[in-house]
């Protein structure tokens, strides 16, 4: 009685402001968080407001592909 696909998947969240700002200048790094999401409840891209240690503020972290 195995189900086809897992409901919970592991996703990587990346800071959107670090990605935008690192094009112009040398960046110290890009903030990334690893979390899980329920595929049935949130089928589209995941976005959370998390703390970015490189920007020193809370920014929107968006889901990226592995």
Curated annotation (Swiss-Prot):
GO terms for biological process: translation. InterPro entries: Ribosomal_bL33, Ribosomal_bL33_CS, Ribosomal_bL33_sf, Ribosomal_zn-bd. Pfam families: Ribosomal_L33. GO terms for cellular component: chloroplast; ribonucleoprotein complex; ribosome. SUPFAM superfamilies: Zn-binding ribosomal proteins. Keywords: Chloroplast, Plastid, Ribonucleoprotein, Ribosomal protein. It is found in: Plastid, Chloroplast. Its main location: plastid. One of its GO terms (molecular function) is structural constituent of ribosome. PANTHER family: 50S RIBOSOMAL PROTEIN L33, CHLOROPLASTIC, LARGE RIBOSOMAL SUBUNIT PROTEIN BL33C. Belongs to the bacterial ribosomal protein bL33 family. NCBIfam families: PRK00504.1, PRK00595.1, rpmG_bact. This is Large ribosomal subunit protein bL33c. The lineage of its organism: Eukaryota, Viridiplantae, Streptophyta, Embryophyta, Tracheophyta. The gene is rpl33.
């Amino acid at each position: 009685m195995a189900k086809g696909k897992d409901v919970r998947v592991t996703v990587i969240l990346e800071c959107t402001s670090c990605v935008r700002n690192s094009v112009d200048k040398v960046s110290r790094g890009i903030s990334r968080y690893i979390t899980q999401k329920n595929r049935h409840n949130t089928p589209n891209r995941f976005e959370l407001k998390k703390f970015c240690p490189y920007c020193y503020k809370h920014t929107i972290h968006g889901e990226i592909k592995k």
